[in-house]
């Protein structure tokens, strides 16, 4: 089969409430959000009805496990049930290619990865929930019409920036890049942040630091693991801090005059990304907190404070406290980042630790190193790893690239060699040498 001439693309994304629209002729009322809006309301309603039918049918065979994936000739669907009565369905078109002597166009049904689709739909919900709270909670406080308006203004810009043909292993792993620090550097950074915390907590007890990032690497976090991942993803993938800091499509959440979170273009700014009167609220631990992000050079500092304490927080004093000793801290991080870059230039690899979500790789997501064949193989290997605790796989691609993948306990390691003339024994020896010399630390606690 030739390379697909039409890539994977979005078919539709819908959020619906199953308890609405129970009377005949009102089924369309179930729909809380549908994209793209160019699909007429009849087809939108049919899509919801088909999803409900699949869920009810599969419950007969697995009452405790809702239907998660549906595969058809033309499309692949992922279904998420994040809240009682709330369902989210993401449908993408399968890619097409030319087959046979008659150059007939055919759908390629096995190209779309289930894990990637599920991770994508989970990220959509988690981002919504972080900045808005749960859908049903909002509905109970306001109305379903208000929920529809909020979903339209918040989810639509988010889903428009997703490139469905470029989702890859990094999407599936959903990890966090950490910058390795020695003890002295760690204590220096911690001392800098702690001094700011203590200064303001003496009068505003709810004030606390949340995250410290340098470029696209996490340095410190005071948050629960999943909260860290969600806010890290927001800063890296939407705000585009780090290597993509000058990206033209970066977006940031701010509160409008009605205290409703909306997306806006980030722009270029040094200091506070959002001013005090427009700070967004994030729902962490079941309660809203104002999120303050401070940017200086390549360092990003995130702080949290209870909304009731926010009016008493002097932004000018906070800025002055952050500027103090900042140059030394930024220089220290810059030096350690350079050492990491030196190390990473020697191999093409991806390492992931499921226990702490640490991901390490010199390969840029959606970068040229991950062509379609490589992406597909990496996704398939990862899916195999999901079913077992330990394994090792060696594959040679049609383009003569060797891929070696290992899973030990909760760690995954993928390394690629473009040595087309090497034998499998030579590649195996190369992996042993590389692991012993450079990657031994990856498989030790």
From Swiss-Prot:
GO biological-process terms attached to the record: vesicle-mediated transport
What's in the GO CC field? intracellular membrane-bounded organelle; Mon1-Ccz1 complex
InterPro entries from the xrefs? Ccz1, CCZ1/INTU/HSP4_longin_1, CCZ1/INTU/HSP4_longin_3
Q: Which Pfam families match?
A: Intu_longin_1 (PF19031), Intu_longin_3 (PF19033)
UniProt family annotation: Belongs to the CCZ1 family.
> What is this protein identified as?
Vacuolar fusion protein CCZ1 homolog
What species is given as this protein's source? Dictyostelium discoideum
Q: What is the lineage of its organism?
A: Eukaryota, Amoebozoa, Evosea, Eumycetozoa, Dictyostelia
């Amino acid at each position: 089969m030739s390379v697909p001439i039409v890539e994977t693309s979005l078919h539709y994304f819908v959020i619906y409430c199953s308890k609405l629209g129970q009377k005949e002729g009102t089924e369309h009322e179930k729909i809380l959000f549908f994209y793209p809006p160019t699909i007429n309301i009849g087809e939108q309603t049919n899509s919801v009805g088909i999803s409900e039918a699949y869920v009810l049918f599969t419950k007969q065979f697995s009452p405790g496990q809702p239907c998660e994936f549906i595969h058809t000739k033309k499309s692949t669907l992922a279904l998420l049930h994040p809240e009682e009565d709330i369902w989210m369905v993401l449908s993408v078109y399968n890619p097409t290619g030319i087959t046979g002597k008659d150059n007939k166009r055919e759908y390629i049904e096995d190209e779309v990865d289930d894990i990637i689709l599920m991770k994508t739909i989970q990220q959509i919900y988690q981002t919504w929930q972080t900045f808005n709270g749960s859908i049903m909670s909002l509905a109970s406080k306001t109305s379903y019409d208000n929920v529809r308006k909020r979903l339209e203004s918040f989810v639509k810009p988010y889903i428009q920036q997703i490139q469905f043909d470029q989702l890859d292993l990094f999407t599936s792993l959903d990890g966090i890049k950490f910058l390795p620090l020695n003890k002295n550097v760690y204590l220096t950074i911690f001392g800098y942040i702690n001094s700011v915390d203590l200064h303001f907590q003496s009068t505003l007890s709810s004030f606390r630091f949340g995250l410290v990032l340098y470029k696209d690497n996490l340095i410190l976090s005071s948050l629960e693991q999943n909260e860290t991942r969600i806010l890290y993803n927001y800063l890296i993938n939407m705000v585009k801090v780090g290597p993509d800091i000058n990206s033209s499509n970066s977006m940031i959440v701010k509160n409008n005059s009605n205290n409703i979170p909306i997306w806006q273009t980030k722009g270029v700014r040094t200091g506070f990304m959002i001013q005090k009167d427009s700070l967004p609220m994030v729902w962490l631990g079941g309660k809203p907190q104002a999120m303050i992000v401070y940017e200086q050079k390549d360092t990003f500092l995130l702080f949290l404070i209870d909304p009731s304490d926010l009016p008493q927080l002097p932004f000018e004093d906070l800025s002055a406290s952050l500027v103090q000793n900042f140059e030394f801290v930024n220089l220290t991080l810059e030096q350690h980042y350079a050492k990491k870059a030196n190390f990473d230039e020697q191999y093409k690899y991806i390492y992931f630790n499921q226990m702490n979500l640490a991901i390490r790789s010199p390969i840029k997501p959606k970068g040229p190193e991950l062509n379609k064949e490589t992406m597909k193989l990496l996704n398939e290997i990862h899916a195999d790893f999901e079913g077992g605790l330990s394994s090792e796989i060696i594959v040679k691609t049609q383009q003569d690239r060797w891929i070696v993948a290992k899973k030990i306990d909760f760690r995954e390691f993928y390394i690629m060699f473009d040595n087309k003339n090497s034998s499998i024994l030579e590649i195996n020896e190369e992996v042993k040498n590389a692991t012993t010399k450079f990657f031994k630390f990856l498989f030790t606690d």
